[in-house]
Amino acid sequence: MIRVLRVMGKGLYLRGDGSRTTKFAEAFNFPDIGAAIDFCRHHGCQGLELMLFVQGAQTLTIPMGDV
């Protein structure tokens, strides 16, 4: 599972980590990285900060540049 923590660009600053509720909260969990990037492109974002869940307990945060 991939969770988008932040979406940046075109005035968007959305958080999906529970610290701030947004109307897009339901769209922050993706089955794969391709779906997350498609979401970013669809909304005209300049980047995503992703949290990848690896083997359940390990997490890795990856800030992305322009996608």
Predicted ranges, named:
Residues 1-25:
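Short aromatic-glycine-(Arg/Gly/Cys) micro-motifs in beta-strand/loop hairpins
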Residues 37-67:
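Short, mixed-charge low-complexity intrinsically disordered segments
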Residues 20-48:
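A short, charged, amphipathic alpha-helix used as a generic interaction element across diverse proteins
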Residues 6, 31, 51:
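Residues in well-ordered beta-strands of folded domains
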